[in-house]
UniProtKB/Swiss-Prot annotation:
GO terms for cellular component: endoplasmic reticulum. Belongs to the AGR family. Required for calcium-mediated regulation of ciliary beat frequency in the airway. This is Anterior gradient protein 3. InterPro entries: AGR/TXD, Thioredoxin-like_sf. Keywords: Cytoplasm, Endoplasmic reticulum, Signal. It is found in: Endoplasmic reticulum; Cytoplasm. A motif (Prevents secretion from ER) lies at residues 161-164. Residues 1-19 form the signal peptide.
Amino acid sequence: MYFPMIELTLVLLASSNLAMSVRKEIRAPQTLSRGWGDDISWVQTYEEGLYNAKKRNKPLMVIHHLEDCQYCQALKKVFAESDEAQTLAQEQFIMLNLMHETTDKNLSPDGQYVPRIMFIDPTLTVRADITGRYSNRRYTYEPQDLPLLIENMNKAIHLLQTEL
């Protein structure tokens, strides 16, 4: 009777030590950038983005993405590493990245997919004319499309200056 009690005590001790040695993965605190650029001032909601776009007379750039999407992660990496894209985003745009859909159907004119990047001008018009290179998913970009994305960012700025 004495030995089974010792065995039970040893099993309990071993399992509690094992549980203590298994640590949860320590993750960095999540910021509004979600990895797209920590030096960029990000808005929290679509409504806040629209308000700031109109108030500050800047285009709103909306990035739809998901954390578990490999294509989103690859695009995020090249966007965050591009000095030109980061500077444009910091200085010329109201920036929003979303991991959920908005109720504005104008932000999904050809469907809900990720990654999807859309531009809204300060008159609150979704610029459906600023697209990526694919005809079936007009607002998606891949990492190798970064030059086109930067060109489209510049186009959004230029249209703002010439149309308004």
